[in-house]
Amino acid sequence: MESSKAMAELNLKQINARLNEEFRGEKRKLVFWYDDKAEFANDIKDIELDNANVYFLQPDNQFYTKYFLERKDKENNYLIYAPFPKPDVRENHLEDTLLYSKRFFADRASLFMADLGVDEKYKNIIEKHIKFFANKDRTQRFYDLEIEQFNEENIIVGMLGSICRTQTCSFEEVVRAVLSDGEYEVNKFIDTFKKYDLHSEFWKLCERHFGYIDNIPSLTNFVLTLFITYTAKSVTGELPESLKSMVSHKSGNIITFMDNLKNSVLYKDRYNELSEFVSNELNIVKVFENLLPEELLYCDTFVCIDKIIIRWIEERLLAEDTGAMLDNHSIKEVVSIRSKMHFSESTGKVYHMLGSAYDIVVSAKYVCPDSFSDILEKYKTSDYKIDQNYRYFYYDYDSLDDSEDFERLRELVENIYTNEYLDKLLQKWNSGILEENTLSKLPLQIDFYDSNIGGLKDRTVVIISDALRYEVGHELYTVLADDPKSNIRIDTSLSVLPSYTRLGMAALLPHKSITMSDDYTVLVDGMSCDNLLTRQNILQRYCDNSICVQFDDIKNMKKSELRDIFTGKQLVYVYHNQIDARGDKANTEDEVFVACKEAVNEIADLIRRISSNANTHHFIVTADHGFIYKRDKLNESDKINVRDRNAFVNRRFIVSTEAIYEDGIENISMGRILRNDDGKVVSFPISSNVFKVSGGGQNFVHGGSSPQEMLIPVLNIKMERGHIDTGNAQIALVSMVQKITSNVTVLEFIQSEAVSDTVKATTYKLYFISDDNEKISNEATLFADSRELDARKRIFRMNFRFKDKRYDKNKNYYLAAYDEGSGEEIWRHHVVMDLVGESF
C-alpha cells in the first residue's frame, strides 16, 4: 500500500511539474485536462500551480465555462480540469475554445507521447504495450534510441530494440541481437517479446522485411530461410528441391542483411556458428552432393562448400589433371578465388597448400636443360620456385590440425619432387659441375669479399644466414622489395664444395688463401676461423673498423645499444643461425621450413631496425651454403655404404686423399675448389642420396653438390633515409552507371596502379547507400592486390543485389567505397534508383 501511495505521489509531482511548464511565459494560456477515468479527482486539490488557477469543469456547466473564460476573466491562466472523457465534437460546446487552447494528458501513455512528440493517432499502440513502459530503465533505453520520426513500425521496433539493447532504431539490429543470443527454441529476447505482447509484432516485421512466412513461426525456420535464400543468390545451378520452399521473395533484403552479418567484425563469429547449425540441420553436404563444383564456386555460405571445392581440386591433382577448370578458371585461379572468401581463416592454409601442390604436380613434366649455363639460368629464373613451392606445401601441410585426408596428395608431391625433379636436375647438374670451365660461369662464393665488400665507402652490414638457400633468399627479396625504403638487387653465387658451414664461412671472409689441413681443419691465411672471435680477428686484418656479432646478441637491443655497436664501424658481419640450427638436429629437422619463414622475418626486421636506429643503410645478405630437404625417410637403397677409411665423412660428401670410384659418386679435387695445390679429393653423390653415416638427421642435408646446396643468394640492399611517400592501390568505377534499373546489377572496377613498393595492396568494401546512410545493397569485397602491369588484367566485376523496398526517384542514392582497414570512405558515386514497380 505504501509503495502504491509513493508511486501516486511521484506521478502527482511529475504532473505538477509538467503543468507548471505549460503555463510559463507572459501570454495567457488555457489548458484542458480531460481525466477520462477521474484518476486524479481526489488529487487535483493538491496541485500547486505557480502561474494559473484551477477551474473545475462539469458536464452540465459548459456554457457558463465558455462565458467565464472568454468574457468574465480574459486575463488569467486556467487549468480546466474535467473528471470525465472529452465529449464528442457535436456535444462539446467548448470545441472552438479548444482550438486556441491546449490539451493536457496525465495517463502514462499520453505523458510518454507528449514528451517524445508522438502523434495521438498512435496512442492505441502505446496503450496496448503500456506494460512495456512500466520499467524506468527500459523506457530510458527507448528514449536513448532518439527516434526522429515516429510511425507504427518505428514505435514497435523501438520497443524491440530497447529489449535487445540496440544502439539504433533498426529492425536489422534487432534481428542481429536475437540471432546472437545463442539459442534457437528458447531465446531470451523472443521470450521477453512474448512477455510484453510484442511476439507477433516481431514475426510480422520478419515477414515485412525478410519475407519469412510460417503458420507457426520459429527462430530455427527463420534462420533456415535466411541462409538458404542467401545461398540461392550465389549458387549458379538450380537449388535442390528440398531447399526451394525456403527461398524468400525478399531476397534483396536478406542478401544485404546476411552480407553485413557475415562481414561484421562483431557478428562474423556468430554467422559462422549459425552457418554450421544450418549446415547440420539440413545436411547440406548430402543435399549438395549432386551439384557440380562449378555451380558452387562463388558460394561461401557454408564451410562445407569449401570442402566440396577442396575435394575436387585434390582429386584433379591426384589424377595429375592440371588443366582442369571450373567456370573457365584454372585450378590456381580457383585457389585464389576461394582463399579470399569468408571462411579463409579456417580454409586458407588448405588452399595455399593446394596451390603449392599444383605447382609441384605441374613439375611432373619437368625438363632439365643440358648445358650447365642453361641449368644455372633456368634455376635462377624459374626452377627455384619448385623448391619454394615444395617448402610452402609442407609449411601449410604441417600447420593443419588434421592432414590425414591429404596423405595421398603428399605422397604424390614427394614422388614428383624427388623422382621427376631432383633426380633429373641433379644428374645433369653434376655432369656440368665437373666441366673444366664451370667455375667461371657465375660469381663464386670464394670471391665474395673482393667482389662485394672491397673498396666500399659506406658502412656496410653483411648478414650471413646459415643455410639460407637461394629460394629462401628470394622470398626475403620479395619481402624487402615491397618496402618503399628498400632498393634491392638479388644475385647468386656458387658456394665452395663441400658446401658445409666451416668452409662456407671461411670463403665469405677476406683472405689471401684458404686451406684445409690434414686433420680437415679449415684455415684462412693460415689461421683458424671456426668461431666468432677468430673470424673477427681475420676480418680486422683487412678492415680495421670492423666487428663480428651474433644475431641473437643484438636482436633485442635498444636503440642506444645498437648505436654503440655500429658507431665508428665501417664493416659489420652479423651471423644468423635459424635454419641450420633447426635442420641439423634429428628431433627438429622437420621444422626446417618453419625456420625458413622465421629467418626471412628476422632478417627483414633486423635490416629495418638497424637502418632506422643505427644510421646504417647498406646491407648484404648471403649464406655459407644451402640445403636439400625431403620429407620421406630415406630407404636403405638411398644410402651409399662407405668403407672404413681415414677420411672426413659427411652424409653428402667425403674428403680424403683418394677418390672414390663407385656408381653414383663423382670426385673433384680440393685444390680446384680452393685454388691451391691441395691433393685431397672431394667425393659426392650425383643424386640426392647420402652416404651411410650414424647419428644426426637424414631429411635435412647439405655439403653436397646440387643447386639447392650450392647456389646461394647475394642480396644487395640500400635503405633510403627519411620518409618515403607510399599510397594504397586506388580503385575506380569503370561502368558508366547513372541509373539503377534492375534488382541485380553487375559493375566493373579497375585498380588504378599495380601493387609495388610504393603502392600498397588494399581491401575495399563496396555497397550502395541512401543519403541518410542506410545500406540498400549487399556488401562486395574488392581485393586491390594485383601486380599486373597490364591495366586490362586489373579489372574486377562485382555483383550487387538491392533491398526489396520502395525507392524515391527524387532522393539521393550512392555507390560508396570504403577502405576496410581504416573504415574511411574513399569515394561515392551518385545514382538514381529507378527499379520498375518499386520506386514511387
Locate predicted features:
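…; additionally, a secondary subgroup of soluble metalloenzymes is captured
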Residues: 1-460, 469-619, 623-840
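Ligand-binding pocket scaffold of soluble enzyme catalytic domains
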Residues: 466
